[in-house]
Amino acid sequence: MEKTPTQIVSELCSRLLQLSRPNKDSLVKLLREVANTLSKIDQPSATNKEKGLKLIEAELRPLKKSIIKHALLKNRDNDVSLLVTVCVSELFRILAPHLPFEDEYLRDIFTLFIAEFSELSDTVSPYFSKRAKILETVSRLKFCLLMLDEDCQDLVHEMFNMFFSLVREHHQQSLINQKSMKTQQRKANTQQTQHSLFNNILAIMSDVLEEEANSSFVVVILENLVKEGEDTTSGADKLASSLIERCADRLEPLICSFLTSCFMEKDSIQTNLKDSYHEIIFKISLIAPQMLLAVIPKLTQELLTDQVDVRIKALNLAGRIFAQPKHCLSSYVETYQDLYAEFLRRFSDKSAEVRMAALKCGKQCYFANPSGNKASGVLTAIQERLLDFDDRVRTQALIVACDIMKFNMKYVPLNLISEASERLRDKKISVRKKALQKLTEVYQDYCDKCSEGDMTITDNFEQIPCKILLLCCEKNCEEFRSQNLELVLSDDLFPRLLPVEERMRHWVQCFAIMNHIHLKSLNSILSQKRRLQNELRHCLTLWRKAKVDNIEEAQRKKKSYFVKLSACFPDASEAEDLFEKLDRMRDASIFDVLTLLLEELSSTNAQIIKEKFLKMIGVKHSLFEFLRILSTKCSPSIFSSEHVQCLLNQLCGSTSANTQLKAPSIKLLLVILNMFPSYLRGSEKQFLKLLEENDSAADELIVVLSKAAPYISVNFGDYYPVLEKVCLEGTRSQTKCAVSAISSLAGSSEKSVFSELCEMLMDSLLCGRNIPTTLQSLACVGQYSVLEYDNIYEDITSYIYRVFQAEPSDNQLPCDQSSGCCNSCKLKIYGLKTLVKSFLPRHGQVVRKIDDLLNILKKTLKSQGHDGIKSCEDTGANVRLAAAKAVLLLSRKWDLHISPEVFRLTILMAKDSNAFITKTFLTKLYKLLTEHMIPSRYACAFSFSLSSPCRDLHDDSFRYINGFINKATRESRTCRDLDQGESLTDSPVYMTVFLIHVLAHDPEFPSEDCRDEHIYARFCGPLFSVLQVLLSINNNGFTIKETAPFLFCIFRAIKRAEDAVDSRKTPRLHILADIGYSAVNILNSIVVTSPQAPRSILLPSSLYSLTSITDNQNKAKSRTRNALEQSFIERIVHIFQSQISMHDQRCQKDSLAVGSEDKVLPPLLGNQIETSITGSTEASQNNTRCSRKRTHLGEHISCNSLSLRTVESEIPIKKLERHTTCAKESVKASVSNKITSSKHSGVVSALKDISNHGEAIIGQRIKLLSPTDGCFYPGTVEKFNSKSNSHKIIFDNGDVELVCLDSESWETLSHESMGQQERLGKETESYGSRNCVPEISHTLAKVTAQKQTTTTKQQNKKVPAKLNPPAVPCFMMSAKSKKGNSDSGEGSVSEVTDTSDNIGPRRSRRQRIS
């Protein structure tokens, strides 16, 4: 009979009992048989279970005894220990619920089990399955509860720690795989499903926690929950998470208590977990968010704490919580609502660090739930931070916004795109740089999605390129110059593989929303690219020539090219060095590739050439990066012929996509072809079709055609009919472009086309068909074909003369209500333009006389209906405006032929009664001046509107004249710095020469007997206004130190000159010069001397002249009678000065005066002067002795090509004596004339060598020469200082100075000549002698002496009486030579007007003694 398993176990164990000391082999053999047999024993059936258990227990008792007898529970051998553990576990399984061992042995059994469990980490061990079986048995029998019953808490803790240490990720994966297998095989084999190792461990630990959960277990679990280590395969955190999820109810109070302690009593916690409680909260929120309901309010409070670091940590935790999938917190929305609200408030936290942390958290929240309820709030908060006052926060907000746009581009809010794009205009450079980087990445993704069909083109994303173009407007950052932005448009804006068609779709949409500033920026980038390509072509040509003939001239040219080329690179200095290095390399292959790129018109082919080239030179090449940039810049990388062809195909195609995009498409086409007309090559037929179909853009297209003519191959006969039709029937602007295109396209064989065109145009003109267009066509023909135009010139002129003589109809209404100009006046204007353009040819020279045209212009400018010229009373101003503009345009080439009268009439257009006419004239004038299209003398016109009562005209004029002065001054200084000579005629100050002459011939000049200072103040308003602007301290042009002396020189020269146009107006010139001098003295609040003040000045001979000495002496007396008293002049100036003060006060009250540059001058020409002068006006400036500083006579330069002639003479000038009075008395001036002979013994004398005089001349009377005014001043030598080699001189007027006589011009005075020299000091012939030799009271002299400062001395320089004539004949006046000789100016070709008489307040460079 076969034995039962229990009997076999009993026999085997009985044999084991008989052994006293069994060896390992026999022991292992027996135990293995026992273990295998025990696995076959099952528990008895439930019907008779108790009886069956007792029988089995009796049969297995030998096993129990043998284990105890041989102390197998404590055996250290691994094999024996494992087999004993298996046998014990099987005993517990078979006899359950009865215990097979007594309590005293249970602890050893627990220890044995734990020891075997620790070996479970060795998954490759052959015994792993046996140990896993033991674990499964322990789990199923809830054996761990027995450990708790036996008070083996330490063993339980040890087991917990051991489980956490041995569990691995693949254990849990095994569980997942088994669950999947269960689902698939549930019906096949549901009885034999085995629990995984992870699940068994989890069951054991869960049973323990459900039975007895305490804080010690919680600490172990939480430690493993947030455990971080190098072992990435550890599954301790997953095990802890599973425990918390399974035993949430039991662990919740303990965990909440622990977390609350971390919030409230963090220092009292002894475990390291106190620093990881945020991580614990986050992990629990993922698995059991309901456990944190009591903890969340504490976290909300942390967001409100004062510590920044605490707020940041709490914010990061809240962000991670809300970044979970939306289903995690769906059941607890209300509980977490307060936390979410406070989380959003942290986006506007007072700390920048907190706001930046909030932005990062907001990004993760949006990524987790882009369509959730919380997403909109997060996006709004992020958008608001784009306007944060801290640039770091704005940068972070920009990064987050761009990442969000890339993540969810299709549904991102449009406002967020716009706000992010605005960061390209941020005030911080760092923000703009980051915005450029991130937004180009966004735009690339957007272009890819549009190309793939996932998105449609939208204006919001197309704003990005527009905003990038605006970076060109930045003047304070080199990174955003056009040199860098060209590379952005070439390489970074579009994906590299994006097709040309897709790129053009985006460009067209961009042009649909671009404004003029965007276009200007794009044009600047393209023009720089074109400039580099042109310069590089020249340089490559020179490089090839240099191979054969490398001369110094070639090197100089190359250096010039390198400077120009390097200016197109981000770092110009570095690029210049690299160009020189490339030159030294002499690599012909590089030059050949660059030539290919310059000649290539296709961007696709250019990209292939560029990639092959860069691959050829290699990344390790020393110039790789430089050549990469250079190859990009010289290739058609932004636009190409392919872009042009694509545009033309879209515009000419029958299935035009969108008519609204037609206009921007044409605009884009014009921008490309205007910069690169060669790109039209290959698309000539499509362009011709477009030209025939688009009347609205015909003029621009024709301009492009004329530019592209040298680069394209066309049949002239195909284009001529279209252009001819435009010349006959088009608009005036189209006609202008059409004639230009005909000239460009017509070859040598087609030059006769202009003859045929002229015949057709004359027939159209005489028949009265489309006269404005016909006149424009004829004018343009005259510019491009002078010979053909000369054949019909007489016919055109006679027709236009008849137009001017025609009577306007009384009932004729204006055909253009906006301009208010009738047809008759319009026709006159068109006729003027036709004649004027014919004298400004683009090709060839005009041999016709211009006198007739200038005569018409003069008559038109004078008045209506003069000499047969008829105009409407209401619209004649438009004709006068056209005539004035015509004079301005003609002055480019015909300025020498423009008479002073025509010049004056043109200038007076600035004071026309029609404000619109005046404003239009000034705008045109300023444009021509800034472009250097006309002589600078016309700038004096601004002074008339500068003193206009119309506020708008005044403001415009002030802006215009400031712009002109600043630009002219910079250019004048540049010439001076480059040693190109210095001439006062180049200075903006020189405009006063022409202004004074215009005023002198003004019919409104006050009468000779007028002594009303208000009338003079109103009339001289233009002069006062321009002087005020010129003497502005903050003017970017000349400073006062330079301006005031130059003005003095001008007024002195005018005082010595006569009116060349009408000698009867000479007294007016002198009166204006007197007023101007006094105005400078009063307006100039700083007493200055300038080492650069010229002694002589050029005056235009067409306006000013000199007569002989005898005539001057005969006329001096009569001119003196016509002169104004000094006190009257001062009252005139003070009226103007009071107006400035009143104006400044009003500006301050209205908070309008922001700075000195914003000050505007009060209107003086109108009827708004309300000044009351009671009594007399005090002199605004004390007189001092004339400065004795010598100035160098500069180079003679002609003025604006004006014909100047020379006469040398000494003109006697009136002497004005100023006396000091009390404030309540009137200032009286006595006028006297003194004719001083040129041989006056005291005026000029030879210099003496007095280097060794020392104390020998103490007490003697001497006279010192002032080099500025040529005056000698008498005085007495009081003492001598041997250390400084200087003498103390007491002058007769009370001044005391220390003088080094070694460097001065002086003479001793004999007793006979003493009185004569004193008279000389009082009666000098120089103009403004009232300032050269002041006669003041002792008190005033004392006050003046106290105001003087110590300055350095300067060596005297001899001034020649006669200089070599300049290239252009000049009129100049010369003072007497130092030897007293005076030359007659009759036969001299060129002389100098000596203005050495200092009419300004003097300041000596010697040391003044109080």
Curated annotation (Swiss-Prot):
Biased composition (Polar residues): 1382-1398
Major localization listed first in the record, in broad terms: nucleus
Keywords (A to Z) from UniProt: Cell cycle, Cell division, Developmental protein, DNA damage, DNA repair, Mitosis, Nucleus, Repeat
CDD domains the record matches: PDS5 (cd19953), Tudor_Agenet_AtEML-like (cd20404)
Spans of repeat HEAT: 3-40, 58-97, 104-141, 154-193, 196-234, 290-327, 334-371, 373-410, 411-448, 488-528, 588-625, 663-700, 714-751, 752-790, 848-885, 916-953, 1121-1154, 1155-1192
Signal sequence annotation: none
Domain of life where this protein originates: Eukaryota
Motif mapping: Nuclear localization signal 2: 847-854
GO biological process, one term: proximal/distal pattern formation
Family as reported in the entry's similarity comment: Belongs to the PDS5 family.
Name under which the protein is recorded: Sister chromatid cohesion protein PDS5 homolog B
Gene behind the chain: PDS5B
